[in-house]
């Protein structure tokens, strides 16, 4: 039996089901299938529910296909959530009853060798969600200017030592692996800063580089702009975010939309869930309704 560290556990499953499902014969979309945890829960509610699942990561989608093979009311697509309108058009579906998106990185992506998302072992600098795209973390780390690096580390990582870290990265080039990058970050930070941080000192910089490689924030904006026209009246949007940049984007979009209203959130995981699944500790769930 796999431990929680090795197995992807869906975040806030009860809360997602309680607030997303309002029609037990509706069409629902899981925009980030991962290993299929949330998708399985949605499909299990009723055989009359139809679930469309998307994921841009072909490796993790293969796992989901195996996990969901017994369900006849699920259809999976290798596609980015940004392209949801294209997928629905191909299925001749104009409106759906609910849309779920989990913006966190999957356990598989962290644990699979060679993906470069983790700072806990030595791997090539990759960090691509979509293995078919060309830009990798290696390109960002080795070819961005010092100013460009400082800007993205500050903006996407909310790292106050961004300039020092960018300078250290440039001075350490070429950087070929994750642990070489960790060492460059370590050199830039005061020892007392490293000691006092609750999370690994490289977390913020790795987050920033991953966001840059995958264009995550612009993708979220594009996705959100599409959502209102894809939901039927009364339809629900459920967004699980894992850091303040994502949550602010979602919060402000819903607040400023004349087609959506927030009905629940932000919900955070219970202490019991965090004990079972530490990955959930920084998650926030917001639910909006199409009006």
From Swiss-Prot:
Listed GO CC annotations: cytoplasm
List of residues binding S-adenosyl-L-methionine: 36-38, 55, 90, 102, 109
A Pfam family that the UniProt record links to this protein: Methyltransf_5
EC identifiers of the protein: 2.1.1.199
Keywords (A to Z) from UniProt: Cytoplasm, Methyltransferase, rRNA processing, S-adenosyl-L-methionine, Transferase
Subcellular location: Cytoplasm
Keyword Cytoplasm among UniProt keywords: yes
Keyword Transferase on entry: yes
GO molecular function terms listed in the Swiss-Prot or TrEMBL record: rRNA (cytosine-N4-)-methyltransferase activity
Alphabetical list of InterPro entries matching this protein: RsmH (IPR002903), SAM-dep_MeTrfase_MraW_recog (IPR023397), SAM-dependent_MTases_sf (IPR029063)
Function text: Specifically methylates the N4 position of cytidine in position 1402 (C1402) of 16S rRNA.
Protein family membership: Belongs to the methyltransferase superfamily. RsmH family.
HAMAP family linked: 16SrRNA_methyltr_H
Protein name according to UniProt: Ribosomal RNA small subunit methyltransferase H
Organism field: Thermosipho africanus (strain TCF52B)
Lineage summary: Bacteria, Thermotogati, Thermotogota, Thermotogae, Thermotogales
């Amino acid at each position: 039996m796999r431990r929680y560290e090795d197995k992807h556990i869906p975040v806030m499953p009860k809360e997602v089901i309680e607030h997303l499902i309002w029609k037990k014969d509706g069409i629902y979309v899981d925009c980030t299938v991962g290993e299929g945890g949330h998708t399985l829960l949605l499909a299990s509610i009723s055989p009359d529910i139809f679930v469309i699942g998307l994921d841009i990561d072909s490796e993790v989608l293969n796992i989901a296909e195996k996990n969901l093979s017994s369900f006849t009311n699920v259809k999976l697509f290798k596609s980015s959530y940004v392209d949801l309108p294209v997928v629905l058009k191909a299925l001749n579906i104009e409106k759906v009853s609910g849309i779920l998106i989990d913006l966190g990185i999957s356990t598989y992506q962290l644990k699979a060798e060679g993906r470069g998302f983790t700072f806990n072992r030595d791997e090539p600098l990759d960090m691509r969600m979509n293995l078919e795209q060309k830009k990798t973390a290696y390109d960002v780390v080795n070819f961005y200017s010092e100013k460009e690096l400082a800007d993205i580390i500050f903006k996407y990582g909310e790292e106050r030592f961004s300039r020092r870290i960018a300078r250290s990265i440039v001075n350490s080039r070429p950087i070929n692996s994750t642990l070489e990058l960790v060492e460059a970050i370590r050199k830039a930070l005061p020892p007392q800063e490293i000691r006092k941080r609750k999370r690994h000192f490289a977390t913020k910089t790795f987050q920033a580089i991953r966001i840059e490689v995958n264009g995550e924030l612009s993708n979220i904006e594009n996705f959100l702009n599409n959502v209102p026209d894809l939901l039927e009246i009364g339809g629900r949007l459920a967004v699980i975010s894992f850091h303040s940049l994502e949550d602010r984007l979602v919060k402000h979009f819903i607040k400023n939309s004349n087609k959506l209203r927030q009905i629940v959130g932000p919900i955070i995981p219970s202490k019991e869930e965090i004990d079972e699944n530490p990955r959930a500790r920084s998650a926030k769930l917001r639910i909006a309704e199409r009006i």
